[in-house]
Amino acid sequence: MQNRKIVVTSALPYANGDIHIGHLVEYIQTDFWVRFQKMRGNECVYVCADDTHGTPIMIRARKEGITPEELIARSREQHVKDFTDFQIKFDNYYTTNSPENKELSEQIYKAAEEKGYITRKTTPQLYCEKCKMFLPDRFVKGICPKCGAPDQYGDSCDKCGATYGAEELGSPKCTTCNEKPVVKDSEHLYYELEPQHEYLEKWIPDHTTSDVSNKLLEWFKEPLRGWCISRDAPYFGFEIPGCKDKYFYVWVDAPIGYIASLKNAGKFEMWNDPNVELYHFIGKDIIRFHCLFWPGMLNAAGFKGPTKVFVHGFLTVNGEKMSKSKGTFVSARTYLDNLPPEALRYYYAAKLGGTTDDMGLNLSDFVQRVNSDLVGKITNIASRGGQMLQKKLGGMLGAMDDEGRALVQKCIDAGETIAKHYEDRKFNQAVVEICRLADAANEYFDKREPWKTIKVDEEATRITLTAALNAFRIMAIYLKPILPVYADKAMKLFGETQWDWASACAVRENCALGEYEYLASRIDIKQVEAMVEAAKAKPGETGEVSHESRASKNKGAPAQVAECAPLKGEIQFADFEKLDLRVGVVESCEVVPKSSKLLKIVLDVGALGKRTIFSGIRGAYPKPEMLVGKEVVFVANLAPRKMSVGVSEGMILFAGEPGVNGGAVTIDGVAGGGTQAT
């Protein structure tokens, strides 16, 4: 099959605000899709840019005593750093305040003018006498003229969805100075869409999903209204050719920025190439600009329209809109100062299903899903298998037996199903399938009990570990669009330099395994709590770009926990010396019936025999078998404790909080049953 040629864009982030975790829903999922396409061997170019024009930029720069150019340069630097640290990889990230965009905007405008689509109308407009400027839609608030909802912007109502002119608002006020504006007449340019009524009505169903097209087509029951494309000076943007003191409305040149970024990347010819697919990823709040005005502008100027517009919903946190007061309006930088980017990328993948439904981020579920699935289920295979192979078997993979080969083949066979989910942007289903493979691999591992067989049959153990690690390798390949850095580390483990989608069909046998490298960490709820508190405290969470960069020095490493439990009473060293800490190999681990906390753990303690310990750590191990084969540290000389469920013969050391983060203290592959731990 011939490789596809694809151009992909995400909506342009505005240069007057921080990137926050709501924005990242779009950029992260676009990055998933682009990386997948590249792994499939397709030529896929991902372009984006900062949206830099408009009154907010001008006013913000004026307040700070700097030029708009200085403001947008600073903002772009921060945006690029945030995207980079979240492992979002653009082929070109540009700016709309560019010579390419100016040239293309004028070209597209003149084409519409020549076709007679541009008209002039004198219209009433709100003017603030204190600020000495006509007020853009977003700089005036008042009562919705349709439903009576208060505190609505001058272009549309959040309550009823109606659109209107700012002069129609009841009790309007300037959002900059809170003064009541006056009405003044001003001549403006309008882009008439009605001449393209038939074209757009046919275009929309073929290039959007049914839920989006059904909404848009409601507007076609009547003649399409003209679209005001000009703004009065003072304004930061491109002046309209032949129109003194009139500037292109930001939504005219913003989408043209896609083409300008492509041109800046040296790939301008791809846009109109009939063999190239064009895809936009956008939020549902900007549908009308991308699915009505934008294809109309492109069509009038002889440019190809997008192949498909992919629309997603908004992000809610703990079931509510993001809130500054609750600390859930979190900037990308505040997140990175407290938590690793891989965790959010994985969680978003597990939740995104390619629909316009809003996506929920539940912070407790976030911790649990990352710890249980990514760390405890998937990474656990590499951790247990890789470290045992390196420490006990010289790091050499062997050959697989029939059972192991069947497991690996199952993983290979799942490849096209997972690929289809990626293609359809059903990333949640891709994650489900990968987790099913992880379940099968863990079941195989636990059934073969390599922690036991290593004592009596090293080659049998090598066969088991070879199959388990090959299964993990395939899963890591399937995860690469979601977790690129994680996958690169896994790739080095197997001594490889490049993975594409077809790499999953190969197996690694009778070869050396590289050094095991840390892949993923468990999330501590305290890290999440620290992030929430930081979000409450930082003024940058208002959505404005702060004066100073808040770049993390540790690039997303977990932050130090601000608070901890108070120290208990002081003890002497002699007290500590009384403890006899030993290593025990977990022979079996099972849930204690009718208990929500207890696990029954049987330890092989070497010459000391076996110990049964009841431990309240069930919350950290949703699947008790995860502990089997682990070498854990326990207090061996603790007096036996009679409990209602039996006699507990020791205490297992635990670090963290059961059910949230942490686990039994392990030293796998270092010691053996009965060894003293010092």
Model-found features: residue ranges?
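Phosphate-backbone binding interfaces of nucleic-acid-interacting proteins
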Residues: 547-678
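N-terminal, positively charged nucleic-acid-binding surface of large information/translation enzymes
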Residues: 1-203
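Intrinsic disorder at enzyme termini
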Residues: 487-575
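Short, glycine-/Ser/Thr-/acidic-enriched flexible segments
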Residues: 13-14, 150-152, 179, 234, ...
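Structured secondary-structure scaffolds
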Residues: 1-48, 100-104, 172-391, 430-434
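A non-catalytic, amphipathic alpha-helix used as a structural packing/dimerization or gating element
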Residues: 32, 70-81, 107, 215, ...
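Beta-strand segments within the central parallel beta-sheet cores of soluble alpha/beta enzyme folds
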Residues: 308-311, 491-493, 600
